[in-house]
């Protein structure tokens, strides 16, 4: 689910930064690079924290952070300061970094050592499937919402009408927020369930 939500943002962000805000491709790229840069720094730290905290707790914290960033994106307009948008991108990278490492640990800890290769393959499959679903679902929701706001079908950014795109963007990122929220609730249930079993 979280890969689906992440790719909603990956599809929307270039349209917002380049078409709606008028940034050059390299400028938009520099801003979006904050996500992987922060994630690279945070992921190993999150991995080391598993010695002190339950992986389920860390993944829940990461998902809560990711859900909050979706709210930030949902409120973005043409007048939103780019430093604020960049902050949300960095916070999203932080949340993803907190989530990824302990989530992989949880997946791998549920299988025997001889099945680790299969589990790793299934984990990669789930990740790639989430990416594909995220791309297809986000574009479907985006252009359906834009078409509704425009009053007729459209499958591209409408020049000179950033308001149409923003309407579609807000709807699309609202869907992404609910996906993140659902993933958070599922993960929280998993954490509480394991705590009950441990007693």
Q: At which residue positions do the language-model features occur?
A:
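Intrinsic disorder in cytosolic terminal tails and internal cytosolic loops
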Residues: 157-160, 190-199
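12-transmembrane solute porter fold
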Residues: 1-148, 167-192
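Short, membrane-exposed interhelical loops at transmembrane-helix boundaries
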Residues: 152-168
């Amino acid at each position: 689910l979280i890969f689906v939500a992440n790719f909603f943002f990956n599809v929307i962000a270039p349209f917002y930064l380049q078409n709606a805000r008028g940034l050059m491709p390299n400028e938009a790229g520099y801003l979006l690079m904050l996500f992987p840069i922060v994630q690279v720094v945070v992921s190993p730290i999150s991995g080391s924290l598993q010695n002190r905290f339950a992986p389920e707790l860390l993944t829940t914290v990461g998902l809560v952070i990711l859900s909050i960033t979706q709210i930030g994106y949902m409120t973005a307009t043409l007048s939103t300061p780019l430093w604020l948008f960049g902050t949300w991108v960095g916070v999203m990278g932080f949340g993803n970094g907190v989530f990824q490492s302990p989530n992989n640990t949880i997946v791998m800890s549920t299988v025997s050592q001889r099945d680790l290769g299969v589990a790793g393959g299934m984990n990669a499959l789930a990740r790639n499937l989430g990416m594909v679903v995220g791309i297809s679902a986000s574009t479907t929701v985006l252009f359906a919402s834009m078409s509704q706001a425009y009053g007729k079908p459209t499958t591209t950014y409408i020049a000179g009408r950033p308001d149409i795109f923003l309407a579609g963007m807000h709807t699309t990122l609202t869907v992404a927020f609910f996906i993140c929220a659902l993933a958070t609730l599922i993960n929280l249930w998993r954490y509480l369930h394991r705590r009950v079993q441990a007693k």
